[in-house]
C-alpha cells in the first residue's frame, strides 16, 4: 500500500490517493475510523428500502467518506495470472442503491454488516460492524471486485494477462507511484523497444 498526493496541473488542486494491491475479491474503500457509518444504519433499522431515507443516509456526515473515496487498487488474480486497475464508481453506487439490509450470518461471519443492493438484488458494497472488538478486516466500508463488477471502471480497459511476463505487474505497481517525468522516460524506452521489435519482424513503423 502506498499513499501519494496528486496535483491537478490545471487547477493546482491537490488530493490524496491510496494505492493498494488486492486479490480479486473483498476491497476496503474506507476504514470508517470514527465508527460512524454502522451506528447510523443501525439507528434506522435492519431493512432500509425508502428512497428518501437512503438519500438522507448518503447525505449524512457519517457517510461523507463515500463521496471522497480515493482508493486506486491494482487487483490481481493469481490463479489466472492477470491484473486490473479498477476505480469504484461511488456516484453510480449511491444513485443505484435500492435497499440496505443487515446481515448477521453466512460465510463465517463473526460480526454483522449492512449490505447495499441495487433494484436487481445485485451487491454493491457493505458497511462492516467495526467496534472495539473488531479488527481492521471487520470494520469500515467494503466492496467486492467479483460481486460488484458493474460498479467499477477499469483503467486498463479490462484484465491484463501477465502469465508470460511477471515483470508487467511490477511495471504497473511502480508506474502508479512514479512521477510524470518517470512515465515519460519509461514510455520512450517502451517505444524504442516496439520499434526494435517491428524492425526485427520486418514490419513498417
Task: Label the predicted regions.
Residues 1-2, 7-12, 21-205:
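Nucleic-acid endonuclease domains
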Residues 16-18:
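Elongated alpha-helical scaffolds
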